[in-house]
Amino acid sequence: MENKVIQDRLTLLRAKMQEEGIDFYMMPTADFHNSEYVNDYFKVREYFSNFTGSNGTLLVWKDGAGLWTDGRYFIQAEAELEGTGVELFRMLQEGVPTIEEFLEQNIQQGQTLGFDGRVIAAMDGKKYEKVLAKAQICIAYEKDLADSIWTDRPDFPAGKVTVLDEKIAGKSVEEKLTQTREKMAKDCANALLLTKLDDLMWLFNIRGCDVECNPVAMSYAYITEDTATLFIQQKALDTQVSEYLAAHHIDVKEYDTVVDFLKSLPAGNVILVDNRYCSYTLYKTLQKNQRLIEGKNPTELLKAIKNPVEQSRMQEIFLKDSVAVTKFIYWLKTHVGKEKITEVTAADYLEQKRREIPEFLDLSFPTIAGYKSNAAMMHYEATPENCATLEPEGMLLVDSGGQYLGGTTDVTRTIALGPVSDEMKKHYTMVAAAVMQLTHAHWLYGCTGRNLDILARQPIWDMDIDYQCGTGHGVGYILNVHEGPQNMRWRFTGGMVEAVFEDGMDITNEPGIYIQGSHGIRIENVMLAKNDVKNEYGQFMHFETLTWVPIDREVIDEKYLNDTQIKYLHEYQKTVYEKISPYLNEEEKEWLAAETGVK
């Protein structure tokens, strides 16, 4: 079935490309800060392709178009691109060219690649330069072709900014600036251009609301050895925030003056830039007169290691969040089949339980509630117009989280609503085993997620199955639900940043199995990396679990587990009951006792 709306938009875009002398036009999923999740204003790729996932790049040329996305979105993209004329390129699959390889093979000498350099990361822009230089291809990077076509484009975001109290942040702005400058000095830089939104919020102890579910404000910062300049929309600042920034000696300038400011800098500064988040436009602006050190934002690692105040508040918040999710599971299991419940109304009920928590601020991402085969799409999102009705059979996968004044949560449970097949039981059991094996990791300091990923993936690989995504990611503190530099994946990919686990880093533990057209299973906890014994061999480490939500006993078949896996699972379920039951009523408590096997 043709999607004429998208086809017509692409026709208008191609006409604009011809007018501007552009042969290939690229649209990533990004804002001016290369954020993972973006405000509606920046959803240009979605506007021209119909693909709604959080990761993907659209490339359009005279007689075709292609979308590159990762394994989380293959099923979703296939459905959403149907009839648009946009071809799906499945990243990291055998025989599928990368976007750079595709350009190298298809763009001709003398042709032009165009994009809006403000939404292309410098790292990517430099790759395209290198690939295309061989064929004398021109890059036109000051072209936002969407603006004249997207006539009802949403307004540029400018939500209210708030101050995060130091008692909640755990460190003052001065302490954070001192730590940042120390790391700048180690990199031999006398200035830092900071463009990553969550790093900016962390550094200045402020929060915004410019991206749905991500408490960030559109901003940049230029940090020197003795000054800090924040570029932010001043209409987003009230008197309290302005006075707070002034009291901490932070010079505030209008957001859209950053390019002129950088152009006005005296030549010869040694400026640290992180090319993953610095836009190609800003990079090219600085490159003309400044010496650039291309490295990682020092703030990223500082932010990832949660301080004692953050850790303490996270433990409190994760417990409250776990209670809310447990109550939701009880409600779901006792009401399904007795009243109409859809994927959407189930998600709404869970949100309602979270809103009852006094510290609740917002969801940390739109809830994913996928019933039966819908759960095979890792980032499926139901709508009131298009959602499944739940029946007392099969399984519902619910991936959800909250933003609280005290932490950001992310938890997934796959819930049996009635009878399931033997294959589903086996798959569920092995996913639970995978979670438990990683939970009990014990390692020497120096390991990254790539070293530990096999602990979760092995039980699933043993069935000749894989999940096309990472096993874990960091989680922000009243910030983005996806945070680096720590992550957990089994293989190295281009541009991937690896980080050694440090005491106080958090990481999700979320293996899964996704069978297209049948079912999807994921179980997800968040864990803290902590120091353990230190001896002549070095510093040993382990994980402490933050998430305490029951694993569905109805779908566990212990014949697939070894004695150690059974022991780990029983210990987790017992701890869930001990921690959660004091907050439940008698009926809920009795159900939880049976659900966890303590009764």
Kindly label every feature range from the protein language model:
Residues M1-K599:
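Active-site neighborhoods and metal-handling regions in enzymes and metal-associated proteins
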